[in-house]
Amino acid sequence: YRGPSNVLWRVGEGAWDSKKITDSLKALPTYGPLRPAGVTPADPQEAVAMMADGTSVSLRMEGVRWARPYRSDTLQGPTPRKVTDVVQTGQQIWVRQVGDAWWLAQVPDVNSALVSINPQNGAVMALVGGFDFNQSKFNRATQALRQVGSNIKPFLYTAAMDKGLTLASILNDVPIS
């Protein structure tokens, strides 16, 4: 977990009133199921988070247990033992509903693309160009200028096998004139 998106107010500086919290949250976008929220009170067992519409939701330990602190690409901190190890009063966080419960969430730092093709007829079954169109209008599946790298090998090898080539086949790799 990379931490809160913002600190709305610090404990000891005077808490914001409900209108100020909701006005701040209404200015933020939603990303798919992720909703911005402001942590009002937080204690070791539970944090209450106010949503942009003024409703409050409860974050319990099962909804924050996953949020080990991010240290580096290869290292995470310890598993939290209480809710306040993860969130504090005054922080702006992201939450999502899981069943009847609300869980802490975060907007991903990375995006990727996916093109799913039906191998029977070559039809495109799904094409995903990123995490959320409202976050980034750039479609990584159709607009990226990167080379496909090894992702294309299964298609090339399958086509070669369909033509009768094997792993032992020798091909003369000279320019065609």
For the regions a protein language model found, what residue spans apply to each?
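Extended, non-catalytic substrate-recognition/exosite surfaces adjacent to catalytic cores, especially
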Residues: Y1-S177
